[in-house]
Every structure is written in structure tokens, then in C-alpha cells.
Design a protein with these regions (language model features):
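S-adenosyl-L-methionine
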Residues: 5-40
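A short glycine-rich, Lys/Arg-flanked "PGG" loop and its adjoining helix->strand segment in the class I
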Residues: 58-77
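A short SAM/SAH-binding and catalytic strip from SAM-dependent methyltransferases
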Residues: 38-59
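Aromatic-rich, lipid-facing transmembrane alpha helices and their immediate juxtamembrane interface loops
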Residues: 9-10, 71-74, 126-127, 132
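Short, well-ordered coil/turn elements that cap or connect secondary structure elements
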Residues: 16, 73, 96-98
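Short alpha-helix immediately C-terminal to the canonical SAM-binding loop
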Residues: 1-6, 88
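Class I S-adenosyl-L-methionine
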Residues: 88-137
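Conserved class I S-adenosyl-L-methionine
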Residues: 53-54, 77-98
Length: 137
């Protein structure tokens, strides 16, 4: 929880009141929300479940995009990144199956500090695959 502690410290230091963190399965929370309340949702390096038999456990899929669409305000943003190429392809396929998001060509999240997972991925020669989406309907 060291990473969460650092984020909480930064939130406190900067006196931010409009940020909420979830350390569990966000899908359980989103399923309970019945209105569009979020301006943006960031999902940075979700578990890639690299083994083929575990791919069904991956968070980002068409169903999750539908759930997230429900809780985003109109023109709200969804940012997803992964460092696993085959997960990126799967995410891209899920996005292409939906017409509820506009894919933004340039990311407004390029300023984000890299996480330890992202830094390690780059050091190991893996690429970061960002997806920046805007709710359009």
C-alpha cells in the first residue's frame, strides 16, 4: 500500500477534495452506481493475467467499457494503459466493438508520472500502450 500512501499524501498536501481512490475491484463499485458522476476514470496497468487460461479474468473488456460508460459524464474521459502487448490488442478490440467512446489520438495524460510498474516495464523493454477515450453518447 506504499503507492496508495504516497497518493494520499499528495492529495492531502495539495488539499484536493475531488479525488477518490479505490483499492479493490472497481467493477463492484461501478455496478452499484446508477448515474453519470465521474469526469474521468484512470486505469493504469491493470493485472494483465498473461496466461491464456486466465484471460477471462482481465478487467478491460466490452462489458467493463459499458459499465464505465454508464458512470462517466457526457464528454467524460477514460484513460487506460497497459504494458502487455496482447492485452493492448484485446483492449483495442473491445474499444472497436463499441461506438460509445471516441478514441482520442493524442493523450491528455502524457504528463502523468510513470508508476513503478510502468518504469519496470520500460526497463525490461516493454512498451506502454495508452488508450484515451471520450464518452460521446
Amino acid at each position: 500500500m506504499a503507492g496508495i500512501g504516497q497518493v494520499l499524501g499528495a492529495i492531502n498536501d495539495n488539499q484536493l477534495a475531488n479525488i477518490r481512490l479505490v483499492t479493490g475491484d472497481i467493477r463492484l463499485l461501478i455496478e452499484e452506481i446508477n448515474e453519470s458522476i465521474f469526469d474521468e476514470v484512470l486505469i493504469i496497468c491493470p493485472d494483465p493475467w498473461p496466461k491464456l487460461k486466465h484471460h477471462k479474468r482481465r478487467m478491460i473488456n466490452s462489458e467493463f467499457l459499458d459499465l464505465t460508460h454508464k458512470v462517466l459524464k457526457l464528454s467524460g474521459h477514460l484513460f487506460i494503459s497497459t504494458d502487455w502487448e496482447n492485452y493492448a490488442k484485446s483492449i483495442e478490440e473491445s474499444i472497436n466493438q463499441n461506438s460509445i467512446f471516441e478514441v482520442l489520438t493524442s493523450s491528455s495524460y502524457e504528463h502523468l508520472k510513470l508508476t513503478k510498474f510502468q518504469q519496470r516495464a520500460i526497463e525490461e523493454g516493454r512498451k506502454i500502450y495508452p488508450f484515451s477515450l471520450k464518452k460521446i453518447s
